[in-house]
Amino acid sequence: MNILMLTFIICGLLTQVTKGSFEPQKCWKNNIGHCRRRCLDTERCILLCRNKLSCCIYIIISHEYTQRPAFPMIHLEDITFDYSDVDSFTGSPVSMLNDLITFDTTKFGETMTPETNTPETTVPPSETTTPETTMPPSETATSETMPPPSQTALTHN
């Protein structure tokens, strides 16, 4: 039983090691030559392969070797793009932010004058407050028990 297992292991390893050497080695440009010890009469030796083998190339190229077709020429004039949606999309393709939007850099209360392009500070008008407008009427608190906020600030100082 041990000899049988050892035989299977050796056969498995041999097939893994020698897979590349079962077919003849190719050489020269686009693998049109074969590595052999001695070239045939219809072949010519061009250079040497490994292990003292000659790279033999047929004198007359046979039809069994098919060359790759040349790549088709692409004329840039024939390529057209559809620019119909250029006006509708103004953002960047990554962030999808609109490039036409500008952010307002002025502070609150400042306006930009178009003549000089300088910020002007405007103070909002002060509102006059009365106790009736600041204090809403309620059932629990009356105006006598709780003074308006402007009077409480003056009395606690």
Curated annotation (Swiss-Prot):
Entry keyword set: Antibiotic, Antimicrobial, Defensin, Disulfide bond, Secreted, Signal
GO cellular component: extracellular region
Cysteine pairs bridged by disulfides in the record: C27-C55, C35-C49, C39-C56
A Pfam family this chain is assigned to: Defensin_beta_2
Domain of life: Eukaryota
Keyword Signal set for record: yes
Statement: the UniProt record of this protein carries the keyword Ribonucleoprotein: no
Signal peptide: 1-20
Principal subcellular localization: secreted
Region (Disordered): 109-157
Any single biological process term in GO: defense response to Gram-negative bacterium
InterPro entries membership: Beta-defensin, Beta_defensin_dom
Annotated Low complexity bias: 110-145
Subcellular compartments: Secreted
Classification via PANTHER family: BETA-DEFENSIN 123-RELATED (PTHR15001), BETA-DEFENSIN 125 (PTHR15001:SF12)
Family: Belongs to the beta-defensin family.
Function summary: Has antibacterial activity.
Protein name, UniProt field: Beta-defensin 125
